[in-house]
Regions:
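Active-site-proximal alpha-helical segments within enzyme catalytic domains
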Residues: 191-194
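Short FAD-binding loop at a beta-strand-to-alpha-helix junction that anchors the flavin cofactor
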Residues: 160-178
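Acidic loop->beta-strand submotif enriched in PP2C/PPM serine/threonine phosphatases
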Residues: 152-158, 162
């Protein structure tokens, strides 16, 4: 905006063509219905998990490594003071819960649920019962619930992150289950790596950083995929879990929280690795 560039809001991207050419094109529909055709030096697909740009890179919107999980998060927003000074991640016999804060008066909370559950199937009283049952030892501060939704769990990495003069970043390139809190962290890392590559390409005519982008980004992506899967499997109760599975899971959790090395690894991965570790 400060540079006076032509930024368009409310635009729907329809397709990307010419990834193999020197001038790829984006076809889109403007907020007023105007048909747009944009000739570009490079196209960055930062258009989310239903990416249009992904088709130009992988050949389809679904081309990638994929895993879906047998549980979801039931999320609520409520008007209440914080129940804790810190985040609460809870693994209980009743399933997982996350107690987080938005502000001094609005709180965000989640509990593990079936992916196909109807968000309107519970009364407010029942929702508080589900949440409280999953955080034994903590008394939740309740208040009016003004938003509820169900968040499905998926892991995805596109087969390719770049084709010609089109590259993917963020959720267009990968998605992770939210347990590890890695989605935004990964997206920012992608953008930093690709910005360096595009600067070298456009200002120095050096394609080597761009050629290296898929492999460089992938190393970090798969570390984050593992961490997100690990946190998810360690903290959630699988529908088919046996008594052995549950006891082993608790043993795994204790192995982490009772070990300085385990706590250090979790903290390092949760907050994000230095970008240089992916270079």
């Amino acid at each position: 905006l400060a540079e006076g560039q032509d930024l368009r809001f409310g635009v729907t991207a329809d397709r990307v063509e010419g990834a193999d050419s020197a001038r790829p094109r984006v076809f889109a529909t403007g907020a007023d219905g105007e048909q747009l055709e944009i000739d570009a030096e490079f196209v960055v697909g930062a258009d989310g998990s239903h990416s249009i740009a992904r088709t130009a890179v992988t050949g389809s919107q679904t081309g990638g490594y994929f895993r879906e999980y047998p549980f979801a998060w039931f999320g609520i927003l409520c008007e209440a003071p914080p129940s804790s000074d810190e985040l609460i991640y809870s693994n209980s016999p009743n399933g997982f819960a996350l107690i987080s804060q938005r502000s001094d008066t609005v709180q965000r909370m989640y509990f593990q649920c079936d992916p196909d559950v109807d968000p309107e199937a519970f009364t407010e009283e029942e929702l508080w019962e589900h949440l409280q049952a999953r955080v034994p030892g903590t008394t939740l501060k309740e208040g009016p619930i003004f938003q509820r939704d169900v968040l499905r769990f998926r892991s995805f990495v596109a087969h390719e992150l770049r084709h010609g003069r089109v590259a993917l970043v963020g959720d267009a390139a990968h998605t992770v289950p939210p347990t590890g809190a890695k989605g935004m962290n990964l997206a920012v890392a992608d953008v930093i790596l690709l910005e360096r590559a595009l600067r070298a390409l456009l200002l120095e005519n050096d394609e080597r950083p761009l050629d290296a982008y898929p492999e460089t980004a992938s190393r970090r992506i798969w570390k984050a995929q593992h961490f997100s899967w690990w946190m998810t499997s360690m903290l959630h109760v699988a529908p088919d879990a046996t008594d052995f599975d549950r006891r082993r899971q608790v043993g795994e959790l204790r192995s982490v929280v009772e070990s300085e090395a385990g706590r250090r690894y979790l903290a390092e991965a949760y907050t994000g690795w230095p970008l240089e570790t992916a270079l």
